[in-house]
Swiss-Prot record:
Source species: Rickettsia prowazekii (strain Madrid E)
The protein, known as: Uncharacterized protein RP080
Lineage, highest ranks first: Bacteria, Pseudomonadati, Pseudomonadota, Alphaproteobacteria, Rickettsiales
Domain of life of the source: Bacteria
Length: 50
């Protein structure tokens, strides 16, 4: 895995936590989860920075 600063790692963990948490809830959270997942993917692919 590429080197990440602590702040980016923390954002990763928060996003993963929210995504996993949302996936256990009703579809009210679906749009939020999609947004988080998209952002996480973009960060992972270094398309954007936080």
């Amino acid at each position: 895995m590429f080197d990440l600063s602590d702040s980016v790692k923390n954002a990763y963990l928060q996003n993963i936590f929210l995504l996993l948490h949302c996936s256990t809830l009703h579809n009210d959270c679906h749009d939020i989860c999609i947004t988080i997942k998209t952002r996480y993917t973009m960060i992972k692919n270094k398309a954007i920075t936080i």
